[in-house]
Amino acid sequence: GFIGYGAVFEADGVVVDNYSVRSNNGQAMFWTNPSVNAQVNALAGYDLVILQYGLNIMQTGVHNYTNYARQIEKMVVYVQQCFPTAAVLVLGVSDRSVKTDTGFEPMDAIPYMLDYQRGAAENTGAAFWPTCDAMRSLGGMEQFVANGWAGKDYTHINYAGGRRVAWSLVDAI
């Protein structure tokens, strides 16, 4: 039978396709068919593929993400094979805070995860952008929550927060 991945109704200009699967660590992309991806790429002509994973994998006190970095490298290579004319950008994890006796503070795993993500991007020739740094330049997760730009879980930004981060990314590009 027919399996549809989307429909195209856009005019010329910048078009963003979001292939989002909640609570996905990136492994779902390997379930996609490379030949179908190549056909989609032939029709859409992607210039850039952005990968953003890792936020829910981090744990307080965990500083070694070697195995995860290998998975990131596999994901980047897979995307490069499916979309050979597109650049690949790995977004580093966003800011995330944890509750302490004195309030909320940034999760200690963030700099370690960022280092592993940055290394995986470098090892595969992908670009890297640290989302966390952009959020912290806007006040960090505590300010995002206070402004209503993130959930009270101090982990996930919402549409309003995403808009601010997106403009930071546009400025960086």
Model-identified regions with their sequence ranges:
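Conserved SGNH/GDSL esterase-like catalytic core that processes O-acyl groups on lipids
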Residues: G1-R70, H156
